[in-house]
Amino acid sequence: MPVQGSQRRLLGSLNSTPTAPPHLGLAANQTGARCLEVSIPDGLFLSLGLVSLVENVLVVTAIAKNRNLHSPMYCFICCLALSDLLVSGSNMLETAVILLLEAGALAARAAVVQQLDNVIDVITCSSMLSSLCFLGAIAVDRYISIFYALRYHSIVTLPRARRAVAAIWVASVLFSMLFIAYYDHAAVLLCLVVFFLAMLVLMAVLYIHMLVRACQHAQGIARLHKRQRPAHQGFGLKGAATLTILLGIFFLCWGPFFLHLTLIVLCPQHPTCSCIFKNFNLFLALIICNAIIDPLIYAFRSQELRRTLKEVLLCSW
């Protein structure tokens, strides 16, 4: 969702300082600092959004079609796909509207454009917040399934999962509305950053604990079968690599955006921070890339879901 046109404001306030946005570029020029600015064309935004949209629509359709996938785990995966779908869809809508406005193909009053922009703001922000929440919910669900396997079905029931999903969506919408209304308050931005760090720590702690338990389990099996130590080490390295990829992708895709928010609070007028602000569009593109990667990590690895997806595609043809 690039912030280039005069009518574009969706999260555009984050692409400048809250106090004096026009001076960002001037500060960089005065100091002679060289800024590395990565330009993200509108066509690339539309392409990334379309890929993410198709992927996540397929995930939601497959889970809705197969009753065997109507479990708490797939409920969270479906909601994650829906959140990513909304992130991509709202981004594509905003980009398309701005392109039409700039080309003169769409005529609209400023008040109408402002209202549309506000709606897209809320959809985008709430879907981003809910996406982070559902990533955390999936981690908690997997943790309970491993460490409380015998009690899992009594702890994580479908009604409880549905209540959790409803609470996440309601909270995401409410907080996104507060964020849009009070985006120029440092406390609001810091709350978003703290929320991201909390999700990162939660996922890291849970997945690392799960990896340690899996390695201990593999070591016990190796002792029973009197296998050599390298086999256990190989399993540990594979698990560590998988964990690194999972958390690394999460941090690389979401981290720059929340670093941007942090710098707005800490150094809004500093030339170096001003250079980082210029790459706001890149940070948003990384979030859309995360929406593309999420189905590959959490959904398409399921054999049952892939089988249902094949049936859906064959029936559509």
From Swiss-Prot:
Interacts with MGRN1, but does not undergo MGRN1-mediated ubiquitination; this interaction competes with GNAS-binding and thus inhibits agonist-induced cAMP production. Interacts with OPN3; the interaction results in a decrease in MC1R-mediated cAMP signaling and ultimately a decrease in melanin production in melanocytes. This is Melanocyte-stimulating hormone receptor. InterPro entries: GPCR_Rhodpsn (IPR000276), GPCR_Rhodpsn_7TM (IPR017452), Melcrt_ACTH_rcpt (IPR001671), MSH_rcpt (IPR000761). Keywords: Cell membrane, G-protein coupled receptor, Glycoprotein, Lipoprotein, Membrane, Palmitate, Receptor, Transducer, Transmembrane, Transmembrane helix. The chain crosses the membrane at residues 38-63, 73-93, 119-140, 164-183, 192-211, 241-266, 280-300. It is a multi-pass membrane protein. One of its GO terms (cellular component) is plasma membrane. SMART domains: 7TM_GPCR_Srsx. Residues 64-72, 141-163, 212-240, 301-317 are cytoplasmic. The lineage of its organism: Eukaryota, Metazoa, Chordata, Craniata, Vertebrata. Receptor for MSH (alpha, beta and gamma) and ACTH. The activity of this receptor is mediated by G proteins which activate adenylate cyclase. Mediates melanogenesis, the production of eumelanin (black/brown) and phaeomelanin (red/yellow), via regulation of cAMP signaling in melanocytes. Glycans are attached at N29. The keyword S-adenosyl-L-methionine does not apply. GO terms for biological process: adenylate cyclase-activating G protein-coupled receptor signaling pathway.
